[in-house]
Amino acid sequence: MAWGTVEAEPEVDNWLGALSDREFGHVAFYIDLLEAEGAKLRGKLTRPLQGDVYELRFHMGTEDHRISYWIASGRRIILLTHFRKTRMNERREVRRAIRAYEKCVAERHNAEDD
């Protein structure tokens, strides 16, 4: 039984739609794990970014990837942004994820509204 439900903001939805079937299956494994475990998912797969925003961490090929998310009311896991992890872009991407979260909260928006 799932801990919650996963909803994707347009950025993540578009990125997922552009993946090959093989890549999508790989990423779906981690998203499904997040859906099954929710806030209980810990260890190397998740990390808090700031406040209520976390990142789902996974490898695809030789690259590290991240999907930022937050847990909204009703155990809804909202996927906010996607990025490839590099040392050079981490601070910028964390700020971008925080802005996406703040926009969601300010607009009382959730992915179901799209």
Regions found by a protein language model. Name each.
Residues 1-64, 73-77, 83-114:
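Basic, Lys/Arg-enriched alpha-helical interface segments
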